[in-house]
Amino acid sequence: SSDLPRRFRELDEEFFNRLGYGAFLRDAFDEYPDIEAEIKEVHVRRATTRKNEGSNLVDEGTKVIVRLYPELFVEGSKEISRVIRHELMHVSDMINSAFEYNVHEEFATSPMEERIITDRYRLFWDISIDGRLANKGLETTASREERKKEFNSFFSKIPDETRELIFDKMWNAEEIITHNRMVELAKDTNKVLALAAGSRTA
């Protein structure tokens, strides 16, 4: 949309606009008409590390903050497009009422448990997003093999065959895996295991 650039605020022009990177965002937004309809402002900020890349909804869901790692822009246009597409899919889920996103979710009472559950939750969401994008024939930040490797490292105690079944269900899920469902799975490995049996009561 032609008015998209005026929505961008607080950008480091040297880092972003003068290098023509706004075009990548415009192209990516064209893939997500739902975001353009709902969101009033998009802020692009620098992520301090690759792990800190991500997106957040603020101001009651009217503003998006996308954090991108500066080195991404050295890697070239394809990688920029992949990362932005992946991040905007997170945003698209957040504004989709069927996803049941809760920005105030408290994952656990202790910091260590919070970190473990949050990391699992993020992995499930990344698998869900990259699976949907890959199944549409779109390039994204990680391949099936890469996400499977991450999944294996998180759930190494689950037997290989069972793990493959569970991962496949997440990657090829016909219906969106909701926020609440991912929180449940992140908190309880038995519920993750139950996915292999196809249990909907898990």
Over which residues does each language-model region extend?
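Long acidic/polar interaction regions in large eukaryotic complex-forming proteins
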Residues: 67-72, 88
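Active-site recognition of the HExxH zinc-binding catalytic motif
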Residues: 78-99
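Post-HEXXH active-site segment of zinc metalloproteases
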Residues: 94-127
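Short, hydrophobic/amphipathic alpha-helical patches that form generic packing surfaces
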Residues: 122-134, 168-169
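Short helix/loop segments within enzyme catalytic domains
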Residues: 133-150
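Pan-zinc metallopeptidase signature
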Residues: 147-202
